[in-house]
Amino acid sequence: MAKIQVILLEDVAGQGRKGEIVTVSDGYAHNFLLKGKKGVLATPEELQKIENRKKKEAKKQEEERNKSLELKKLLESKVLDIPVKAGENGKLFGAITSKEIASQIKEELGLDIDKKKIEANIKNLGPDEVHIKLFTDVKAVIKVNVIAK
């Protein structure tokens, strides 16, 4: 049985993930992968296309990482003042949520940050720190000052 190399265009159970080069029997390749548009023959042109796509993706990832590092510098250089209602002993009525912090960042700095990337657990008045995941390996720690209204 002849074996040929195929580049997968989508995830195929038992074979591999999208973009991988797999070696399969020619019958399986022609009757299932190629016919069902789940793969293409691994010709030099197709391999070059994949290589170019990977380079573009790596460049895009690096640009996003650099933007995240710049954003981290900006965020860490600022202190957010968040006015909230609080009881007599400095306890908040509830907690400050990531949504509130995201809206305060947008209001003060004009930056849109997804609330899901913000890790906040603030329940008292005074200074505190909030962690924001900007990229896979870039985290910003911003200073927050919670003040009573």
Curated annotation (Swiss-Prot):
HAMAP family reported in the protein's UniProt record: Ribosomal_bL9
GO CC aspect terms: cytosolic large ribosomal subunit
Function: Binds to the 23S rRNA.
SUPFAM superfamilies for this protein: L9 N-domain-like, Ribosomal protein L9 C-domain
InterPro entries, alphabetized: Ribosomal_bL9 (IPR000244), Ribosomal_bL9/RNase_H1_N (IPR009027), Ribosomal_bL9_bac/chp (IPR020594), Ribosomal_bL9_C (IPR020069), Ribosomal_bL9_C_sf (IPR036791), Ribosomal_bL9_N (IPR020070), Ribosomal_bL9_N_sf (IPR036935)
Species of provenance: Fusobacterium nucleatum subsp. nucleatum (strain ATCC 25586 / DSM 15643 / BCRC 10681 / CIP 101130 / JCM 8532 / KCTC 2640 / LMG 13131 / VPI 4355)
Keywords on record: Ribonucleoprotein, Ribosomal protein, RNA-binding, rRNA-binding
GO biological process: translation
Matching NCBIfam families: L9 (TIGR00158)
Segments passing through the bilayer: none
Gene Ontology molecular functions: rRNA binding; structural constituent of ribosome
PANTHER family referenced in this protein's UniProt entry, alphabetically: 50S RIBOSOMAL PROTEIN L9
The family this protein is said to belong to: Belongs to the bacterial ribosomal protein bL9 family.
Coiled-coil intervals: none
Protein name, per record: Large ribosomal subunit protein bL9
Keyword Ribosomal protein: yes
